[in-house]
UniProtKB/Swiss-Prot annotation:
It is found in: Plastid, Chloroplast. Binds 16S rRNA, required for the assembly of 30S particles. One of its GO terms (biological process) is translation. GO terms for molecular function: rRNA binding; structural constituent of ribosome. It comes from Jasminum nudiflorum (Winter jasmine). This is Small ribosomal subunit protein uS14c. The keyword Electron transport does not apply. The keyword Transmembrane does not apply.
């Protein structure tokens, strides 16, 4: 189980990303429209002004039940270990059992 502080930090990052999403997107559009490099520098500074944690690359997908960030399967929203346990307990319909 992941520490609760890590899960809360991840939620805060998601909120920041949603808050600054439009600012980042508009800045990127403006940068692509302007051909000269000297004018682009203003928009690059504007793109760097939001907090670092608002960048979408800082987000991690986490396991729904444990909060684990590694070995996450998008289709199920679970980590590999929990997914394997649920397969063996027949809690996921239509999934075939395998061992690795």
């Amino acid at each position: 189980m992941a520490r609760k502080s890590l899960i809360q930090r991840e939620k805060k990052r998601q909120q920041l990303e949603q808050k600054y999403h439009l600012i980042r997107r508009s800045s990127k559009k403006e940068i692509s429209k302007i051909p000269s490099l000297s004018y682009k520098s203003e928009f690059y500074r504007k793109l760097q002004s939001p907090p670092r944690n608002s960048a979408p690359t800082r987000l991690h997908r986490r396991c729904f039940s444990t909060g684990r960030a590694r070995a996450h399967y998008r289709d199920f929203g679970l980590s590999g270990y929990i997914l394997r346990e649920m397969f063996h307990a027949c809690l996921l319909p239509g999934a075939t059992r395998s061992s690795w």
